[in-house]
Amino acid sequence: MAAGPISERNQDATVYVGGLDEKVSEPLLWELFLQAGPVVNTHMPKDRVTGQHQGYGFVEFLSEEDADYAIKIMNMIKLYGKPIRVNKASAHNKNLDVGANIFIGNLDPEIDEKLLYDTFSAFGVILQTPKIMRDPDTGNSKGYAFINFASFDASDAAIEAMNGQYLCNRPITVSYAFKKDSKGERHGSAAERLLAAQNPLSQADRPHQLFADAPPPPSAPNPVVSSLGSGLPPPGMPPPGSFPPPVPPPGALPPGIPPAMPPPPMPPGAAGHGPPSAGTPGAGHPGHGHSHPHPFPPGGMPHPGMSQMQLAHHGPHGLGHPHAGPPGSGGQPPPRPPPGMPHPGPPPMGMPPRGPPFGSPMGHPGPMPPHGMRGPPPLMPPHGYTGPPRPPPYGYQRGPLPPPRPTPRPPVPPRGPLRGPLPQ
């Protein structure tokens, strides 16, 4: 356990332990810091006259990461009722002091060094244990303390966040401490900040920087909608941040139909237009062999570019037109009825067209009436029909039932054997 020469030690993997009680020994110090990592050796300088240690020691670990971890978990724990101080024991530790020292006033007497360290270490690296000024006779706190940060960013954040906040039911005051041997000059001046920015040791070798000064995680890139490895949106989709294309008005060419094809015909009476004129191609009357250009290719399949609104104008099957002529007049012939069913012929002159056959599904449109004629009236109950009888109101008492009528008994057959007809 005895330490070798200082020149042979790994100063970066060695920690300083202060505030030790007189009962602490080197074996106890070894077992305590073994919880943080593999310990190479321990050393507690002793007085040559009394042979007692002087209240501090050194613990060398196998690696620098173990020393940083020991500083993180062992600093300010209580050993025999006294909080111990654990920090780096490197030879240039004093060069890390950039002057970011703050003063904390109006402290409650119950506040100790560990509470201050746990509270203010959230703002940055603390070089030394917080120093609470105490009465040398009684050991009671005088109500103020000092903390030395490793950077001005940490001290600025601590002053901004903690000044005026309540700690143990007392509002504390946090500000930069006065410099020693100076006339009212405080730390945190522009000259100190400039020297701290030019000091490479303050940025490269801070105590336990593995935990407090870890680099921030890289920000995730914004997701870009891509199609087949490019930054363009998929085909048919508008680019991000733009509005969808407007719906074309009735009669305009849809996007999927080439200009060479004739536009689909308009339904009768749509948009206030009347029937086509005599000079319009395909506007012949039924029975003259002229019909509208068929909007579907053979087989009843719609064109690939037609919209749902145009499909609805041509009927659910896409096999006819409202103005198509009767069978045999140039239009599409109707389907043959099943065997045993009458052939649905055209209605007589002046009669409304027939409705859908009985048993057809709801919503299935029947044949369109001729232009200018009204369809069949909606199904209404007969005049004077009031619906099914209503049940009697609650609490209604029925009258006495009439006595049952006596039913006549059947005649009793005669007793004895039946005789045949008497002889003449």
Swiss-Prot record:
Family annotation (InterPro entries): Nucleotide-bd_a/b_plait_sf, RBD_domain_sf, RRM_dom, SF3B4_RRM1, SF3B4_RRM2, SF3B4_spliceosome_assoc
PROSITE patterns the UniProt entry points to: RRM (PS50102)
CDD domains cross-referenced by the UniProt entry: RRM1_SF3B4, RRM2_SF3B4
Modification type Phosphotyrosine: residues: Y56
Keyword Phosphoprotein assigned: yes
GO molecular function: RNA binding; splicing factor binding
Biased composition (Pro residues): 232-268, 332-381, 388-424
Organism domain of life: Eukaryota
Subcellular location: Nucleus
Modified residues (N-acetylalanine): A2
Boundaries of every RRM domain copy: 13-91, 100-179
Compositional bias segments (type: Low complexity): 222-231, 269-280, 303-323
Region (Disordered): 207-424
GO CC field: nucleoplasm; nucleus; precatalytic spliceosome; spliceosomal complex; U12-type spliceosomal complex; U2 snRNP; U2-type precatalytic spliceosome; U2-type spliceosomal complex
Record Gene3D superfamilies: 3.30.70.330
Keywords: Acetylation, mRNA processing, mRNA splicing, Nucleus, Phosphoprotein, Repeat, RNA-binding, Spliceosome
Illness association: Acrofacial dysostosis 1, Nager type: A form of acrofacial dysostosis, a group of disorders which are characterized by malformation of the craniofacial skeleton and the limbs. The major facial features of AFD1 include downslanted palpebral fissures, midface retrusion, and micrognathia, the latter of which often requires the placement of a tracheostomy in early childhood. Limb defects typically involve the anterior (radial) elements of the upper limbs and manifest as small or absent thumbs, triphalangeal thumbs, radial hyoplasia or aplasia, and radioulnar synostosis.
Function: Component of the 17S U2 SnRNP complex of the spliceosome, a large ribonucleoprotein complex that removes introns from transcribed pre-mRNAs. The 17S U2 SnRNP complex (1) directly participates in early spliceosome assembly and (2) mediates recognition of the intron branch site during pre-mRNA splicing by promoting the selection of the pre-mRNA branch-site adenosine, the nucleophile for the first step of splicing.
Entry similarity comment: Belongs to the SF3B4 family.
Name of this protein: Splicing factor 3B subunit 4
Gene designation per UniProt: SF3B4
